[in-house]
C-alpha cells in the first residue's frame, strides 16, 4: 500500500492554499502599490483560510512572503517600494496547513515589458515545466538539472548556481537539494512518495549573484534581470503530481 498517500493529501491542501494566494495576488498586483501591501494581502489571505505563512519569522525573516523585483534573484524583502510600470516581480508564497508546506512562486510584469524580458520569463517557466514533465520513479536528480540547464543555455540565459530546489513536507527545507544544473543520470534516484520543489532562477546575464547587507536579498552581480517560477511536487508510482497548480489556470504572464 502506498504509505505516502496521507502525506500527499495534506500536501495538496497546503499547496492549494499557496496557489490560491498567488491567484488572489495575480488579480491585485499593479503599478502604484507597495511590496509591503502585497505582503499584507498574502498574509491575510493565508491566515483567513486556515494557514500561516512559513517565511514569517523564519530565521529572523520579518515578512510573510518574498518579493523580488527586476535584478533581485530571490528572497527580496517586502518594503515601501512602490511598483512601477515596467517592473518585473517574483512573488514567493509558502503556506502551512496542518503542519505541511506548500511553496510556489510566480512572475508578474507591470505594464509593457520588452521582448527580451518576455523571452526570459517564458524561458524560465518553460524550463521548470520541461523538468517537471520528465519526473518519474527511477529518474535521477541530475536529470532535472540537466533538463533546465541545457534548455536555458540554448536560449542564451544562465542558471543561478547559489540557490536550488529542496525537499519539503512537514519541514520548510529538507533533503534533497534539487539543483537546476547538472549531468544526466547523476545524483539521487527519485522514488514514489518524495516531495520537493523545482524553482529555477534564471538570469538574463551571467549567473553570478551577490548578497545585500540585509543578509537575505540576492541580486545579479552584473545587474541583469532575473526570473523565477516554483512548484511543489510529489513523485507518484508512475509519474508526478503538482501540488501548487493555479486554481484559475494562471501559469505565466500575461495572466488577465
Where are these regions (language model features)?
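Active-site neighborhoods and metal-handling regions in enzymes and metal-associated proteins
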Residues: 1-256
Amino acid at each position: 500500500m502506498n504509505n505516502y498517500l496521507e502525506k500527499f493529501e495534506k500536501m495538496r491542501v497546503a499547496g492549494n492554499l499557496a496557489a490560491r494566494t498567488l491567484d488572489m495576488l495575480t488579480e491585485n498586483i499593479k503599478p502604484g502599490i507597495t511590496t509591503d501591501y502585497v505582503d499584507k494581502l498574502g498574509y491575510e489571505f493565508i491566515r483567513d483560510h486556515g494557514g500561516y505563512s512559513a517565511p514569517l519569522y523564519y530565521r529572523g525573516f520579518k515578512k510573510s512572503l518574498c518579493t523580488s523585483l527586476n535584478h533581485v534573484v530571490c528572497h527580496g524583502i517586502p518594503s515601501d517600494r512602490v511598483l512601477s510600470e515596467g517592473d518585473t516581480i517574483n512573488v514567493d508564497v509558502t503556506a502551512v496547513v496542518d503542519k505541511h508546506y506548500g511553496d510556489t512562486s510566480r512572475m508578474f510584469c507591470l505594464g509593457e515589458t520588452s521582448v527580451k524580458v518576455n523571452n526570459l520569463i517564458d524561458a524560465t517557466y518553460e524550463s521548470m515545466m520541461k523538468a517537471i514533465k520528465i519526473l518519474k520513479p527511477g529518474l535521477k536528480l541530475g536529470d532535472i538539472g540537466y533538463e533546465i540547464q541545457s534548455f536555458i543555455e540554448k536560449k542564451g540565459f544562465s542558471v543561478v548556481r547559489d540557490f536550488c530546489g529542496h525537499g519539503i513536507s512537514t519541514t520548510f527545507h529538507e533533503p534533497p537539494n534539487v539543483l537546476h544544473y547538472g549531468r544526466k543520470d547523476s545524483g539521487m534516484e527519485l522514488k514514489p512518495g518524495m516531495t520537493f520543489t523545482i524553482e529555477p532562477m534564471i538570469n538574463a546575464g551571467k549567473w553570478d549573484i551577490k548578497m545585500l547587507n540585509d543578509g537575505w536579498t540576492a541580486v545579479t552581480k552584473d545587474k541583469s534581470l532575473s526570473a523565477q517560477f516554483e512548484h511543489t511536487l510529489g513523485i507518484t508510482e508512475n509519474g508526478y503530481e503538482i501540488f501548487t497548480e493555479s486554481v484559475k489556470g494562471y501559469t505565466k504572464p500575461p495572466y488577465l
